[in-house]
Amino acid sequence: VDWPTAAFWQELAGVYPDAKIILSTRSPESWYKSISETILAAVWAPDKWPAPAVEWFRMASKVIARSLGDAQDKDAIIAAFTAHEAAVKATIPANRLLVHSAKDGWEPLCAFLGVPVPDTPYPRTNSKDEFFEHIKKADDI
């Protein structure tokens, strides 16, 4: 599950002890670039968004503080990302955990979930442009 739900991975893993956990991974620098150009950029300027999105950003800023600490400090954010990955790997048993990068594609993901590999290309979604389009659509809610 994408952010912000991923900030509550420990609670969710405890409530669903038989659930399989997929840890989406990427380089810390590429993750920081992505989050700083999307979630953090939006949270730092919530008043420029439609009213329904503003409430979401207020919630998001609380989750960011809980999971990343000082969202203005790149080194602290990257350290939180690295600590998050290490904690998930140290906590979740190997039979419940798949560490997956989008570049790995369908095969390891489908094998882990016990489902057939689709005949469609692995999706590329959640881009910066898509992120901001979703926020703009909040005005239609």
Task: Please identify what each model-predicted range represents.
Residues 69-72, 84, 88:
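Short, positively charged, low-complexity/disordered linker segments
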Residues 71-78, 94-99:
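Active-site rim elements
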Residues 1-4, 76-84:
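Soluble or luminal CAZymes and related metallo-dependent hydrolases
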